[in-house]
């Protein structure tokens, strides 16, 4: 079991991000890595490199002859600064199929964008596309959004965040 975390909208024809993040069941991470290596190899990406940080495997497949490079992050579950806010099972319960890929549903896609950008992102200034994604999710699911942020943080924090989001 797996899902693509974000930037999946134009896959497989085009990647709109710098990489593709694939969240896999933690117990299947080694198997996912083996499958990914064979996919790279079968598509002419014969040079393989990876950097491993705990459950994050940053993989690069490169093909000299076809001048192609692909960066896919395989992640066993989802951690933010070492903290597991949601288990793989909790996240997987909020997935759907989109263009042949398993992805988060609309609500959780927005929640995870908020969590990643709020707690795990190094740059304090949000890009407009991220602001828009968070804002649109909040506007479509205001009660659920605030309740979920309050559940994983606190009611006071959720209120402050909603105030900021509403001001966009």
Identify what each model region corresponds to.
Residues 1-20, 24-168:
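Conserved NTP-donor binding/palm subdomain of two-metal-ion nucleotidyltransferases/polymerases, i.e.
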């Amino acid at each position: 079991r797996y899902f693509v975390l974000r930037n999946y909208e134009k896959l497989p024809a085009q990647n709109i991000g710098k990489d593709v993040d694939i969240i896999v069941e933690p117990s299947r991470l080694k198997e996912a890595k083996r499958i990914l290596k064979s996919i790279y190899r079968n598509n002419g990406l014969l040079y393989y490199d990876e950097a491993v940080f705990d459950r994050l495997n940053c993989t690069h497949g490169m093909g000299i002859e076809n001048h192609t490079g692909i960066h896919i992050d395989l992640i066993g579950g989802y951690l933010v600064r070492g903290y597991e806010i949601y288990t793989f099972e909790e996240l997987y319960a909020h997935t759907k199929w989109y263009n042949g890929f398993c992805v988060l549903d609309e609500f959780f896609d927005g929640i995870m964008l908020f969590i990643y950008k709020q707690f795990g992102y190094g740059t304090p200034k949000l890009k407009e596309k991220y602001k828009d994604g968070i804002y649109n999710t909040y506007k479509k699911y205001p009660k659920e959004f605030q309740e979920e942020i309050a559940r994983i943080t606190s009611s006071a924090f959720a209120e402050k965040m909603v105030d900021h989001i509403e001001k966009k």
